[in-house]
Amino acid sequence: MVYKTLFALCILTAGWRVQSLPTSAPLSVSLPTNIMPPTTIWTSSPQNTDADTASPSNGTHNNSVLPVTASAPTSLLPKNISVESREEEITSPGSNWEGTNTDPSPPGFSSTSGGVHLTTTLEEHSLGTPEAGVAATLSQSAAEPPTLISPQAPASSPSSLSTSPPEVFSVSVTTNHSSTVTSTQPTGAPTAPESPTEESSSDHTPTSHATAEPVPQEKTPPTTVSGKVMCELIDMETTTTFPRVIMQEVEHALSSGSIAAITVTVIAVVLLVFGVAAYLKIRHSSYGRLLDDHDYGSWGNYNNPLYDDS
């Protein structure tokens, strides 16, 4: 029982490790996930194990059901789950990468005999919170069980944070004497296009099937407000510069001599006007009315020198 439990935990850990293997052409698939700790139930048959199935749902199971609780980190922040493979080839979903016994296996998982088919699936929850459902199908011979090596780094360690929308992607791992990643198909939100730069010793040519969709960007149409603002600014600048130019021109045009000449001219004009008015008044003035005494009273008109009283 203990052996089966450890075996199941090792397979689960190896599945998580395969997702975080480094590749020559790094393909980072961003998933903002809030992963709740799922309850994983392993269903196995005695001796010749045809299929070990792990699913987060509560299904029917026989007497050899081992409830294993896989503790997953609960996080409120989006996590970036990157799928990487070191010195391995990314091919189409239908092709298999075949290596020899001398080829190094990826760290964290090695098998001695039999073909191991490991399928890791991440599905998006209907509420927007993706849940990790791991379905591992293992076929092996009962004589030589595969030797599993614990991963060097914890598989639950999140990499860099990302803000890209959630997506559904599946990673199918088929191992024949050595574990390799054969297909990576991200679907949903667009990811960075893959560009594998290094090739392994195999004869296959790496092909990439990742579809990159352009992200729609909102472009604001040009408005006429900017033109109005520019016109207003130009008007303000012109209105503020014109008086300054005029004042500068006046300051350069009017010197002290010109100011004195203007002042003297104004004073002369004023004196001339008052002089002409005084001359005309003096010339047309009279010494009084040339009337009789009875018109002015008994005292007579003594103010008029032409008046003759006798």
Swiss-Prot record:
Q: Spell out which residues are annotated as carrying Phosphoserine.
A: 298
> Would I find tRNA-binding among this entry's keywords?
no
Ranges for the region named Disordered are: 40-224
Q: Outline which residue ranges sit on the Extracellular face.
A: 21-258
Q: How is it modified after translation?
A: Highly N-glycosylated and O-glycosylated.
Main localization of the protein? Answer: membrane
* Entry's Gene Ontology cellular component terms: cytosol; early endosome; endosome membrane; Golgi apparatus; Golgi membrane; late endosome; nucleoplasm; plasma membrane
* Membrane-topology annotation of the record: Single-pass type I membrane protein
What stretches pass through the bilayer? 259-279
Chain intervals with Polar residues compositional bias: 40-74, 92-103
Attached carbohydrates are found at 58, 62, 80, 176
Q: Where is the composition biased (Low complexity)?
A: 150-209
Compartments, as annotated in UniProt: Cell membrane; Golgi apparatus membrane; Endosome membrane
Cytoplasmic side residue ranges read: 280-310
* Superkingdom field: Eukaryota
Checking Pfam families in the record gives: PARM (PF17061)
Q: Does Ion transport count among this protein's keywords? A: no
Q: Which family does it belong to?
A: Belongs to the PARM family.
Organism whose genome encodes this protein: Pongo abelii
Q: Which InterPro entries match?
A: PARM1
What keywords does the record list, in alphabetical order? Cell membrane, Endosome, Glycoprotein, Golgi apparatus, Membrane, Phosphoprotein, Signal, Transmembrane, Transmembrane helix
Question: Tell me, what does this protein do in biology?
Answer: May regulate TLP1 expression and telomerase activity, thus enabling certain prostatic cells to resist apoptosis.
Record's protein name? Prostate androgen-regulated mucin-like protein 1 homolog
What does UniProt give as the signal peptide span?
A: 1-20
